[in-house]
């Protein structure tokens, strides 16, 4: 009886102790659950942000500020938007980015900071749960902590992969806009030198064409402008299909509303249709002409028709490249950031397509640099021939004498033809007209002689003053 009583007491005591442990464990679990809920609701967003597949709003702003900063600093969209005007009327839909988000290295360091913070938190949580698990009724805490760490690691892996593809796309974009900037600068230099050759050709063509031999360097320089013009426009035309291909592949990933606002903001033509296709010439705007390419050497507008057509051909080809490159950048700026899968696809396509376009642009830059070197040599040779040897054959006495002999022969032939025409006396009106024309030629010759007398007197005066100074 005593033995049975002792056994029943031990069983009851063991049962009560087990129930007490269960109660304590449930109470501890409730307290721990409240602590985790408080941490997730109030403290966790302040430390790491919301735990989901989407990135934090600050990270999204950080990334797009980096893109905008790259584009703005490359001067590809500066001056072609309506931010200044809309600032006084209403809040603009796009603001200037901050220079603190100016490089992919800062963006990567920011992510490394978040990743390090996550590792430290996971380590502290693991150590704390291991210490609490030493108590028999808190062993489940370690299981909860390990489950949370695994889930957090999975989220961080997705986060890391998103950062990685974003940084790849950002690096490709950075390389692309830098190449665009170099391409534009080199193109403007070539264009300015072509205009300089054109100006020299227009000034010298009428005076040189009749008196210089065919193998003279000055006459040879007159044809170099045409060669450079066709080389440059041909280079632009080869790049245009590659730009169009990249634009057609990037456009489906852009948010329609964001893209529409950006095209309106930068006054770009909305060439995109419902079938993910576009027409470059639809709604083209003349307000997007680059000042350096379209207003360079504005004073030289008196070219002949052939040269003007060549220069206009260059400007048209470059204008199309400028429009479509801005549309590519606007498509990238309008990418939505709403899911991991969408971002993975969009930024991978940016990394691949924009990277390929950058490679094609690099190859074109090599050819453009060759054209630039040739244009520099042409301009230097033209300047050397026109300054160091200013019209050597025209200014010599023999050439001047032959020129006046030809002029004298023409005047004598005209005099004889008019005198014979007057002697016939068939048409009085035609005789009067012929005499008027003859008188006008004489007046021009008198003006030329008067100008020669004036210039000769001026030269004599300068010579006299120079002798006095000595």
UniProtKB/Swiss-Prot annotation:
GO BP annotations, alphabetical order: peroxisome inheritance
Record has Transmembrane helix as a keyword: yes
Keyword Transmembrane helix in annotation: yes
Cellular-component GO terms for this entry: cell division site; cell tip; peroxisomal membrane
TM regions (residue ranges): 22-44, 111-131, 135-155
One Gene Ontology MF term: myosin binding
Membrane topology classification: Multi-pass membrane protein
Compartment annotation: Peroxisome membrane
Glycan-linked positions: 204, 221, 385
Main subcellular location: membrane
Keywords for the protein's UniProt record, in alphabetical order: Glycoprotein, Membrane, Peroxisome, Receptor, Transmembrane, Transmembrane helix
Family the entry assigns: Belongs to the INP2 family.
Function according to Swiss-Prot or TrEMBL: Required for peroxisome inheritance. Acts as the peroxisome-specific receptor for the myosin V motor myo2.
Name of the protein in question: Inheritance of peroxisomes protein 2
Organism the protein comes from: Schizosaccharomyces pombe (strain 972 / ATCC 24843) (Fission yeast)
């Amino acid at each position: 009886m005593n033995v049975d009583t002792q056994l029943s007491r031990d069983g009851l005591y063991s049962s009560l102790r087990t129930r007490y442990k269960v109660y304590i464990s449930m109470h501890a679990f409730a307290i721990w659950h409240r602590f985790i809920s408080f941490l997730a609701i109030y403290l966790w967003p302040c430390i790491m942000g919301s735990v989901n597949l989407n990135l934090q709003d600050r990270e999204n702003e950080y990334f797009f500020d980096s893109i905008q900063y790259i584009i703005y600093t490359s001067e590809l969209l500066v001056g072609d938007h309506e931010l200044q005007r809309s600032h006084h009327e209403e809040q603009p839909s796009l603001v200037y980015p901050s220079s603190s988000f100016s490089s992919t290295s800062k963006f990567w360091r920011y992510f490394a900071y978040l990743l390090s913070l996550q590792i430290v938190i996971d380590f502290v949580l693991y150590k704390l749960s291991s210490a609490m698990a030493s108590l028999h009724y808190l062993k489940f805490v370690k299981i909860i902590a390990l489950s949370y760490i695994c889930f957090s690691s999975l989220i961080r892996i997705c986060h890391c992969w998103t950062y990685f593809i974003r940084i790849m796309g950002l690096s490709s974009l950075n390389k692309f806009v830098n190449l665009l900037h170099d391409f534009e600068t080199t193109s403007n230099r070539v264009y300015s030198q072509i205009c300089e050759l054109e100006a020299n050709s227009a000034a010298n063509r009428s005076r040189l064409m009749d008196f210089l031999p065919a193998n003279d360097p000055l006459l040879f320089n007159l044809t170099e402008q045409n060669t450079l013009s066709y080389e440059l426009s041909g280079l632009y035309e080869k790049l245009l299909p590659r730009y169009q291909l990249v634009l057609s592949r990037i456009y489906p990933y852009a948010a329609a509303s964001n893209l529409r606002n950006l095209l309106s903001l930068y006054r770009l033509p909305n060439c995109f249709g419902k079938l993910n296709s576009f027409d470059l010439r639809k709604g083209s705007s003349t307000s997007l002409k680059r000042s350096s390419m379209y207003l360079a050497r504005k004073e030289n507008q008196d070219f002949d028709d052939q040269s003007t057509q060549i220069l206009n051909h260059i400007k048209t080809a470059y204008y199309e490249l400028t429009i479509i490159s801005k549309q590519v950048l606007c498509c990238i700026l309008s990418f939505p950031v709403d899911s991991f899968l969408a971002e993975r696809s969009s930024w991978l396509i940016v990394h691949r397509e924009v990277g390929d376009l950058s490679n094609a642009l690099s190859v074109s830059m090599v050819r453009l640099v060759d054209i630039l070197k040739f244009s520099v040599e042409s301009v230097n040779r033209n300047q050397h021939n026109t300054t160091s040897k200013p019209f050597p054959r025209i200014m010599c006495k023999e050439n001047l004498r032959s020129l006046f002999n030809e002029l004298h022969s023409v005047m004598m032939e005209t005099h004889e033809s008019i005198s014979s025409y007057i002697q016939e006396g068939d048409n009085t009106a035609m005789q009067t007209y012929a005499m008027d024309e003859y008188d006008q030629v004489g007046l021009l010759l008198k003006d030329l002689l008067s100008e020669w007398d004036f210039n000769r007197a001026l030269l004599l005066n300068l010579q006299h003053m120079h002798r006095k100074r000595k």
